[in-house]
Each structure stands twice: as C-alpha cells, then as structure tokens.
Amino acid sequence: MKNSKVIKLQDRVPKLKNQKKRNKPPVNHRLILYISILFLLVLFLIYFRSPLSNIKKISVFGNHYMTDEQVMEKSGITYKTSYFRVTARQAEENLKKQIEIKSVDVKKRFPNKIDIHIEEYVTIGYINKNGKLQPLLENGKTLDILPSGKLPVAAPIFEPFKEEKMKELISELEKLTPTILRSISEIRYTPTTSNESHLTLYMNEGYEVSTTIQDFAKRMEAYPLILKQIEPGRKALIDLEVATYFKYLDDEKKK
C-alpha cells in the first residue's frame, strides 16, 4: 500500500469538467438560421395574402376632368389591391389610354401608399354644343359635355365651325400666352366676302376684337399693349386684322 498513488480530489475536478464539455452536444447555428429565415418567410406570406397588405391611401394630383375615383378605376388600383401586386408601369399605361391625360407618374410608398401625378392636355377652349360645353384639348380631342356651369379651366368659348379652320385655330391657340388666352371670353367664326378666316373675339375686359385665323397668335401679342391705351370705362373695338388700332364705340353712338 506504500506504493499506491493517492490522487487528490482537486486534481480530478478539472478532468471531470473537460469531460462534461466534450459530452455536451454542439449548437447547430446553421439550423437556427434556416429556421429563422423560414419563419420570416411564413410571416411574409401571411402578410402578403392578408388584408393587412392592401393599399391604405391613394393620392391623386393634377386631375381636373376625372374624379379621384375615376382615376383609381382606370389605373386598376383600389383599396382592395395588395401593395405588392401594384405595378406602377402598368397603372401608368392604363391611365395614358385616357384622351385627356398627357403624362402620368405612379409612385409606391411603402408600406401601403400610392401617389398618382397626372398632367392633362391643356384646355384651349370650350365648344358650345346646343347650350352645353365640351372641353377642347390641345391635342384636338374633345371631352364629354360638362355639367352646366362647370368650367374647371379658364378658356374661351366658341361655336363649332369648319373642321379645317378649327384645326388652324387650335394650332394658333396653343401659341398664346396663358394671360392672353384667359382674357378671351368667346371666339366666333365670322367669315366675310374678303376674308373667310375672319374671327370676332369678345374679351373678358369688355372689348371686341376683329382679327383672323392666319397668324392669330402673333396678332394677339399686341392686345396687352393696346389695353394700356384705352381709357378706363370706355367701350372699344380693337382691329388686329390688317393694321393694329382701336376705335371707341361710344363715339359712334354719339354721332
């Protein structure tokens, strides 16, 4: 027994600890990662298919002739549409089919908002059709008759006339400055024996203008300058057909 080796308890404890560590199963970090990703995918699919992913707000800008509801309908986007199913390009193509829309930009705002920015063709006038007004656009298209008294955009009113002359006039109206265009209240096609393109304009300032379709926009450039020469409160006829001048109508009445 003298040669027997005595092992102290404190010497054996570290060996037992190391043995326990070796027996402990390793943590599978990759498996945990896969499970986490799978869990997130399941959550996403549930959200994607649930009403929670539906559009909550649709904002429309720049529309005059179409209501917000009509824009939404034509775009194909509703409050029942999932945000993730909205394709901005497809919505834009749908809206560009409308004759009044010149350009459109659809933006998605995560998580559930849509912005629709519209640019309409400029309204250059209203055609008086049996007492009802039809907007005439710069692209030459006319819209449906407006409800009585509703004028979304300030523009002149005129009676329909020859299509050929109408196209010429539209081309000239596009060249007018917005200020001059807003000054025109009514345009009448009044051909004469010497000028089949003669026009009579009734201005919002109360004056009458005699002019012609040829170079109409260029002739109208003189209108603001002539206004400065007319005495306030007096009625005048402004002639822009050949020369550029005006005459007071109340002087003729006195004679």
Swiss-Prot record:
Look up the record and give one Gene Ontology term from the biological process aspect. FtsZ-dependent cytokinesis
* The keyword Cell division is annotated on this UniProt entry: yes
Compartments reported by the entry? Cell membrane
Identify the InterPro entries for this entry.
Answer: Cell_div_FtsQ/DivIB_C (IPR005548), DivIB (IPR026580), FtsQ_DivIB (IPR050487), POTRA (IPR034746), POTRA_FtsQ_type (IPR013685)
Q: How does it sit in the membrane?
A: Single-pass type II membrane protein
For this UniProt record, the keywords arranged alphabetically read as follows:
Cell cycle, Cell division, Cell membrane, Membrane, Transmembrane, Transmembrane helix
Q: Which family does it belong to?
A: Belongs to the FtsQ/DivIB family. DivIB subfamily.
Q: Could you tell me which PANTHER family the record lists for this protein?
A: CELL DIVISION PROTEIN DIVIB (PTHR37820), CELL DIVISION PROTEIN FTSQ (PTHR37820:SF1)
Return the protein name.
Answer: Cell division protein DivIB
